[in-house]
Amino acid sequence: MDELNACTECGFTTTVFSEFQGHIEKHENEHSRSSSGEMSNSQTIEWGDGIQSSTPSPRSTPPSDPTPSPDSDEHLEHHISITEITNTLIKKEPGTKGQKTVHVCPHCNFTTCMSQHMKSHLEAHERHQGQMYQCDICKMQFSQKANMHRHRMRHSGVKPYECRFCKKRFFRKDQMQEHSMTHIKTGFGFDCPVSQCNMQFSQHNALRAHLEETHTISSTNPASCKRCNLMFANSRRLLLHFQTRHDDSESSPKKENTPKRKKLSNGNALPMDPANMSITEQLQRMVKSEFSPPNTDTSDNSTSSEFDKIPPSFPMANPDILLMCLNQMNQFNGFGENIPRPMLNIPNIPLPALHNIPAVAAIVKQDQVQLWSEQTSSSVSVSAPSPSEQSHSPPANESSLSLTEKEKSPTPEKEDEENVECCHCGMMFYDNTMYLLHKSLHSDGDPFKCALCGTQCGEKYMFTTHVIFADHSTQATTSA
């Protein structure tokens, strides 16, 4: 069998040596006509019968002593090393202006258009002999496992990186960044990416000229990004990093500072005073002030009065979770419907059909009866005078005048009855009914144990949070 002759410059292979010699002479004539003269003389690799020229073994090295053809010239007879392959092993189609040169690795199927990448790849073959990571599909080898996995995604067809301008997808992140630069260059108003440089340019070419002339960025004099202080030894890489990583927020159109939408309220809405807020709003404010971290950002407007008027972001399962105690209408005999709706600060809607435990209703009903009996006895004592008072009673007009004055002037006892404080939570209630509803949520033995579901909270803030956000409808359904 004739020996196979392969051209290292363009990959041409033939077993007829006369054809191969004419092919080599054609390359030499082209090199003599070219003015560059940088291309070295072509070299020939002759492979044995048991070695394939197109796809050699992935982990094998080139033959240390290839056998040349007996009629070959002198420039085809010397040894081929790794450095010589780096400079001469290319596949080139001359004659077309601007066409890229494709470099082919002799050990695996790695190809690239950049000579520096090929040089690094061949050096990796030399350093990691027998330890390269190989793709199981195309047998291409890599010195790093991450690069092999990145290459493996090409075979899967998944393109994880998307251009934010045209939504085109890419296999590799650097390819997506290079593509994004084609969109970024068409814009205007470019900032210099070098830290402590506030220069701005209207055109992208002017910015690149500024980086090359003003900032001499090199390996000995690296420059840092003005946003993240990452160091770069190449101006092009710095510009690519800055305009694809950080400049997306700057290049986007700035939004106008429009006033925030305020919470809608009717004309009869009460001011934000603790006396006029519902229990839910008081609990929400107390929990928010305790659990929210301190605001150290001066630019944040979350503490402004306008922000407080925005409705809370967390959802509420019911209009007022404390109305869970008012669901059993038969035991209360219409007690829940008699509570004024403005006092509860909720719309005029029917109460939620929740099924609470009967003990809560009994406690509220008993306390309400006691409160009603105390008010009745006090009113009877005021309206029914004693016999001594009847004997020394003033005239009818004077007694009526004194009664009206007593009604107009509030007594200290009445003020104390209106302002009731929970001894466990420290919350102030300006209505006895709301205090009784809140009191029924505490268990008798443990004040911080929820009387609705039996959850042990431990302290007042956890108890308050549990009362506001816990979903007691499931326990109510099971108890029913």
From Swiss-Prot:
Stated family: Belongs to the Ikaros C2H2-type zinc-finger protein family.
TM region(s), chain numbering: none
Subcellular location: Nucleus
Protein's name according to its UniProt entry: Zinc finger protein ztf-16
Comp. bias intervals (Pro residues): 59-69
Gene name as annotated: ztf-16
Oxidoreductase among keywords: no
Bias-annotated ranges (Basic and acidic residues): 244-259, 404-413
Tissue: Expressed in the somatic gonad, hypodermis and cells in the head and tail. Expressed in amphid and phasmid sheath glia, amphid and phasmid socket glia, and in neurons in the head.
Keywords: Metal-binding, Nucleus, Repeat, Transcription, Transcription regulation, Zinc, Zinc-finger
One family name in Pfam for this protein: zf-C2H2
Disruption phenotype: RNAi-mediated knockdown does not cause defects in somatic gonad development. RNAi-mediated knockdown in a ehn-3 rd2 mutant background enhances the defects in gonadal development in the ehn-3 single mutant.
Functional note: Positively regulates the expression of ver-1 in the amphid sheath glia of amphid sensory neurons. Together with ehn-3, plays a role in somatic gonad development and is required for proper gonadal primordium assembly and somatic gonad precursor cell morphology.
Biased composition (Low complexity): 292-305, 376-403
Zinc finger motifs (C2H2-type), residue ranges: 5-27, 103-125, 133-155, 161-183, 190-215, 223-246, 420-442, 448-472
PANTHER family registered for this protein in UniProt: PROTEIN ESCARGOT, ZINC FINGER PROTEIN
UniProt-annotated stretches for the region Disordered: 25-75, 243-275, 290-311, 376-417
InterPro entries linked: Snail/Krueppel_Znf, Znf_C2H2_sf, Znf_C2H2_type
Cited SUPFAM superfamilies: beta-beta-alpha zinc fingers
GO molecular function: DNA-binding transcription factor activity; RNA polymerase II cis-regulatory region sequence-specific DNA binding; zinc ion binding
GO cellular component annotations of the record: nucleus
UniProt biased composition (Polar residues): 34-45
